[in-house]
Amino acid sequence: MFVKILPPEVRRKIAAGEVIDAPVDVVKELIENSLDAKATRIEIEVVKGGKRLIRVKDNGIGIHPEDIEKVVLSGATSKIEKETDLLNVETYGFRGEALYSISSVSKFRLRSRFYQEKEGREIEVEGGTLKSVRRVGMEVGTEVEVYDLFFNLPARKKFLRKEDTERRKITELVKEYAITNPQVDFHLFSEGKETLNLKKKDLKGRIEEIFESIFEEESSEREGIKVRAFISRNQKRGKYYLFVNSRPVYNKNLKEYLKKTFGYKTIVVLFIDIPPFLVDFNVHPKKKEVKFLKERKIYELIRELSSRKHTILEIPTLNQKTESYKPTYEVIGQLNETFILVSDGNFLYFIDQHLLDERINYEKNGNEELACRISVKAGEKLTNEKIKELIKEWKKLENPHVCPHGRPIYYKLPLKEVYEKLGRSF
């Protein structure tokens, strides 16, 4: 058999298949383009799980009119110019293959207005063939519409999952990018209904909103590598999310290490900030997998974090007198006959007295209704002895974080923030 050179249209479809093999891949590439364009609001709309339509609209800086036709060409990128630039990639996109791949396997429309221009440009591409270019009136930003994904690749289209499955994958992906970009509003619409509405927040607030759980934060840094973990324990099942330089990534060994280190019933959201030249995102066409140059150092930092995972609050024996308590620890008292205030020297804890007592009683008798009925109530004045008794029992709880109904037992306020707000050093 003789070697043959494949026609351009065949090579184009093969290359596109390496980057795009499902609707979620399209959404990923378009969200990354929006984030690289400094968008602060991103709208994603899907119809039939993205098989019929994917639309992503942002308020980023837009695409310059001179570049509007270039963006659908293979290798068209503004992120890198030479091979050595791959060692210092700080953007999501850098290969210049995303829009080329998407437009090769769909009916594609892109409209964009550059922030220095008074009008926008629109291009239409079908199966890799440019159909039209025209001027359009629009706001600054970019909007991409992808119709009939894989219309020209029936074999690939046949292997797409059910609409609900594709929809769930897209929802999970949007949540991942929302986690690592809390400064951006994310809105997801499916079949005309808004299914996600995530307003900009601080990072911890965004994570707690998405997972509807209380998280503790730990961080460690060494030799220019910083590891930051948000941890929520005692879940029904564990979930483990890894972000490297703000990019959602997958690393099988690291995920297994997180499971073994933090436990199989813990949600762990791990951020690794590492110099670009110490990490390789160019392992796979989808940039989902990564390799580290100093992987052992990352494991050491994670192990250091895990050693603190049970030190949320170290409470001394409360039958001692106050004077003999550790100097960094203090039971302050009761607030509004509803909360018990406790400080460990670094944080001030507002503990809901009813929820705490309810958790204590539930772990003793296993009956939610009975535990609620016999527990102290909000609005009930507690003696110092009762407060000490509750705190002592709190230390022994199997799950000291949430009540039997899943509500958080306490809120933790960093004293450092209080000092900073009042212009004092901590």
Curated annotation (Swiss-Prot):
Matching InterPro entries, A to Z? Answer: DNA_mismatch_repair_CS, DNA_mismatch_repair_MutL, DNA_mismatch_S5_2-like, HATPase_C_sf, MutL/Mlh/PMS, MutL/Mlh/Pms-like, MutL_C, MutL_C_dimsub
**Which GO cellular component does the record give, naming just one?**
mismatch repair complex
Any one Pfam family here would be: HATPase_c_3
CDD domains tied to this protein = HATPase_MutL-MLH-PMS-like (cd16926), MutL_Trans (cd00782)
Biological process terms in GO annotation: mismatch repair
Extract one GO molecular function annotation from the record.
mismatched DNA binding
User: Does the entry feature the keyword Protein biosynthesis, yes or no?
Assistant: no
Which key words tag this protein in UniProt?
DNA damage, DNA repair
Concerning its family, UniProt says:
Belongs to the DNA mismatch repair MutL/HexB family.
Briefly state the protein's biological role: This protein is involved in the repair of mismatches in DNA. It is required for dam-dependent methyl-directed DNA mismatch repair. May act as a 'molecular matchmaker', a protein that promotes the formation of a stable complex between two or more DNA-binding proteins in an ATP-dependent manner without itself being part of a final effector complex.
Q: What is this protein called?
A: DNA mismatch repair protein MutL
State the organism named in the record: Aquifex pyrophilus
